[in-house]
Amino acid sequence: MSNILRRGRLEAAQDEEILRYTSSMEADRWIFNADIVVDLAHTVMLREQGIIKEEDCSKILSGLLKIREEGMEKLDFSYEDIHISLESRLIDMVGEDVGGRMHSGRSRNDEVATCIRLTLREELLGLLEEIFALRKTLVSLAEKHSETLMPGFTHLQHAQPTTLAHHLCAHESALGRDFDRVQDAFSRVNLCPLGAAAFASTGFNLNRKRTQELLGFEGLLENSMDAVSSRDFLIECASVFSNLMINLSRIAEELVIWSSSEFNFIELDDMYASTSSIMPQKKNPDTAELMRGKTGVSVGALMSLLTICKGLPLSYNRDLQEATPNIWRSVETVRASVRVMEGMVKTMKVHPDVLAAESITGFTTATELADTFVRETGIPFRTAHQIVGMLAKEREKPTMEKIDSASEVVLGESLSSKGLTENMVKEALNPESNIKRRKIPGGPAPEEMKNYLSKRKTELELNAQEIATLKDIIDSAFENLLSVVEEYRKI
């Protein structure tokens, strides 16, 4: 059979090199199922609008279901994309007088935009579930370690005592924002461009609301020119994925550092480690290292999308074909990374004794000591900061005698004469006491962490309901579509 796309206007066939250069068939594997679903919905609507006959609709629908059953490998890969290849296969099965009517009132421009949105919508739903699982694992682990002391860091230097729960919840909080960003992006992806045709809509009396309903989209992307030419939703999603991967890379970096001999805070499960081909003692955190590296894939995809979409005039341009593979590569990477991270966190062994011992290394209680000077003696914080800084230079545990000596240099009088006692100093230098004092919202005090974790669990319950609602809407739409398809096949 001659090429159904080129036979009228173009005489020369494309040679293999040009075909390989222009073809999107490999990337279109991502949208094969979506294309079938979009064709089903469009065909149903064509019948309902009286644009095609009932018997033709029945044959087209049966042919499409047969193609879905056969799979993509049965299609002719000599076509430049999945849409024409699929239509060609349908025409082979039911004849052009029937199959050739399916594309009425439609262009590949609105078709591909709809397929991309349909597929990406499913990927975003899966990603929401996976982020949810990772957050839930972090919250569960935090509940077990609300009193597990550890050093907090700034500049990778020991800074102040905190708890492992507080640290884990910092990551969970960031992932919560990632979850929100994915939800926000979902709402803009979940719009239907079908019916926009090439860009100026169509003279056929299409019912765009009907195909929107059959495909489970939240609304229409109304302006037909914008509907086919815009890929800002891809850029938005790629940005969201990059942000998420950067947050995951921060956790991965800490897992690499914490599992080192120098830190020994945790041990990764063997499943997530490798060994050396020459050094038999090695247990390398390769999975976490790869996650850092794969962050570059997502960031690179975002940069590619921005560059491809820059400066394109309205409406559709073939450049956009090069945009789509970037989003599939990015979403595949980010979803796998979230799943792998959840497994690493869930299975890692925590070393509480090491964490507790390190919580006081490097004079981590210095801030609380300065705060105690302020609270108990009334001196300005900046003055207290200077006194404690002088004590820190000595690299020895501060005593009352050393404190008074330093304060006399700075103030000309001892702090003991202003009411400071040894018990106050002892309390200030105790990391557990440090943490218990930090009970304002967001602090690491066990009682505050209990309240915080309770709120996070409530939020997770709400998020679970939100995911379920989105899935139910889409599942119901597809069930309805398939029900209508089965009804219309019976002629």
From Swiss-Prot:
Keyword Ribonucleoprotein assigned: no
EC number: 4.3.2.1
One Pfam assignment: Lyase_1
Phylogenetic classification of the source organism: Archaea, Methanobacteriati, Methanobacteriota, Stenosarchaea group, Methanomicrobia
InterPro entries: Arg_succ_lyase_C, Argininosuccinate_lyase, Fumarase/histidase_N, Fumarate_lyase_fam, Fumarate_lyase_N, L-Aspartase-like
Protein family (similarity comment): Belongs to the lyase 1 family. Argininosuccinate lyase subfamily.
Any one of the GO CC terms: cytosol
Protein name according to UniProt: Argininosuccinate lyase
GO molecular function: argininosuccinate lyase activity
Lineage top rank: taxon: Archaea
Localization per record: Cytoplasm
Enzyme kind, highest EC tier: lyase
UniProt cross-references to HAMAP family, sorted A to Z: Arg_succ_lyase (MF_00006)
Catalytic activity: 2-(N(omega)-L-arginino)succinate = fumarate + L-arginine
Pathway: Amino-acid biosynthesis; L-arginine biosynthesis; L-arginine from L-ornithine and carbamoyl phosphate: step 3/3
Keywords, alphabetical: Amino-acid biosynthesis, Arginine biosynthesis, Cytoplasm, Lyase
GO biological process terms on file: arginine biosynthetic process via ornithine; L-arginine biosynthetic process
